[in-house]
Amino acid sequence: MEEAELVKGRLQAITDKRKIQEEISQKRLKIEEEKLKHQHLKKKALREKWLLDGIGSGKEHDEMKKQNQQDQHQTQVLEQSILRLEKEIQDLEKAELQISANEEVILKKLKSIERTTEDIIRSVKVEKEEIPEESIEDIYANIPDLPSSYIPSRLRKERNEESDDEQNRKALYAMEIKVEKDLKTGESVVLSSIPLPSDDFKSTGIKVYEDRQKSVYAVSSNQNTAYNGTDGLAPVEVEDLLRQASERNSKSPTEYHEPVYANPFCRPMTPQRERVISPGPNSQERMVMMKANGLDHHESESVHGMTDGLSERRSNGLAHTSPTRPTPQPRSKVQQVEEMVHTQQKRMPSPWEESSIRQNEYEVSPRTELSPSRASPGKSGPQCSSPICQEEADVRYNIVHSLPPDVDDTEPVTMIFMGYQQADENEEEKKLLTGYDGVIHAELVVIDDEAEDDEGQAEKPSYHPVAPCSQVYQPAKPTPLPRKRSEVSPHENTNHKSPHKNSISLKEQEERLGSPARHSPLGVPGAGDGTEDPSLTALRIRMAKLGKKVI
């Protein structure tokens, strides 16, 4: 009751204080109005007094004098009213201060008497404890004709919960998570997470979070119970810590190991250059070895005129097969090559063809030289009539693409380009090409030291083992020179152009180099007195210094 009276006294003080404040504001407005009137009357009285000084005696003078006296009287009344209002305002302000002081006293008393929320909750709990609740058993006991064996479902559920409480709350698994919390930002970082056996887990520490599924206990870094002021964790924080711990467990360091294959035949062996002594058994044995290694790519070898023992292996990932596979011939130092040479019409080389010719001047075949003197039209091998077969033979036995098997790729080789010559139809050419039957036979001569001809030399791979299947490594393919439509020979297959159709044959090159009437191609001056070409002389001098002999 005392608290209620104090609350009422405080409310009354607040109301009186509010009324006094409104009254003070009204009186101040009235004072402002009185001051305005007082100033107006003062100005009017001064003006009338100034006018009376200039007017003589008479009726008008008397009236103005009387009006001036009335104005002065009103001015005095206004001054008194203003003073009275100011005094009343001062009294009201004093009363307001007194009411405020009384309000503060009442507020202090209320704070000393008023109960906190905890006290109110505690008192409510005590009141509930004082009032005994009727149990369910007592309620059902008052029901007549109820069998004694009947147990209400609610009571049965409560009994089951009490009996199975320990079993339901037994930990299925436990995990120790080390967490570092930044006191500035409040962020928690999981340092490590270690799973623990649920049997060895003991509820040590302060419980900071619990629901029907999981419980979280806070333990200090020295495995002791954390201090009692540990704050609880929100469900969001618990979920975040569990997510970080699971992510940390899922991360495993990268392990590097050797490649593992399902069977030992899934990776091809590095292809080696073969050193064929007898033609028959070696080729068959090598083919069986490739199949045993489990190669998925079809290997095709075209052996044509194998007097040199050279074989080109072509393979790709598209199951390419060779049209023919002739029987290899015994090995020797000379490889006979067939080329079909077609007579071209008269034309000048275009600028791009000239640049391509200059580029081809520096194409090198390691440790190989051409000897025009050994070309004989009588040594012709088997010929193929189809254009596709001719192109394959042209590419297969081209001197730029052929590579002897016993050449060491690491040693440098010097070659001198002899030049190109356009084939023109004239009388001189007809004289030079007497007995020409459409086929020129060239010989590939390998200049090598006899002492280095060691058959037991270590074998080296002919090309990269995975180059045909690689998408990164693709060897450059020779591009054919551009030709006009009118300059294409009708005997050539235009769908399969070979980049070496325009190259001059060795026999024709020899005859033109030895001819005094022909001019040297590419601007090299030839001797006009019948002597041999200076480039050929330079070649002979170079070979003589090396201890070789040009045949």
Curated annotation (Swiss-Prot):
Modification(s) after translation: Phosphorylated.
Chain residue numbers at which the record places covalent cross-link Glycyl lysine isopeptide (Lys-Gly) (interchain with G-Cter in SUMO1): 178
Entry coiled-coil feature ranges: 12-106
Alphabetical keyword list: Acetylation, Cell projection, Coiled coil, Cytoplasm, Isopeptide bond, Phosphoprotein, Synapse, Ubl conjugation
A Pfam family of this chain: Paralemmin
Self-association state and partner proteins as the record states: Interacts with GLUL.
Region (Disordered): 247-267, 298-387, 452-536
Domain of life where this protein originates: Eukaryota
Family membership: Belongs to the paralemmin family.
Modified residues (N-acetylmethionine): 1
UniProt-listed PANTHER family: PALMDELPHIN
Crosslink feature (Glycyl lysine isopeptide (Lys-Gly) (interchain with G-Cter in SUMO2)) location: 125, 178
Modified residues (Phosphothreonine): 270
Modified residues (Phosphoserine): 135, 163, 322, 350, 371, 376, 385-386, 498, 515, 520
UniProt gene name: Palmd
InterPro entries for the chain: Paralemmin
Localization terms from the record: Cytoplasm; Cell projection, Dendrite; Cell projection, Dendritic spine
One Gene Ontology term, aspect cellular component: dendritic spine
Protein name per Swiss-Prot or TrEMBL: Palmdelphin
Tissue expression as described in the entry: Expressed in the brain and the spinal cord. Expressed in the anterior olfactory nucleus, the olfactory tubercle, the nucleus supraopticus, the nucleus of the lateral olfactory tract, the piriform cortex, the cortico-amygdaloid transition zone, the septofimbrial nucleus and the indusium griseum (at protein level).
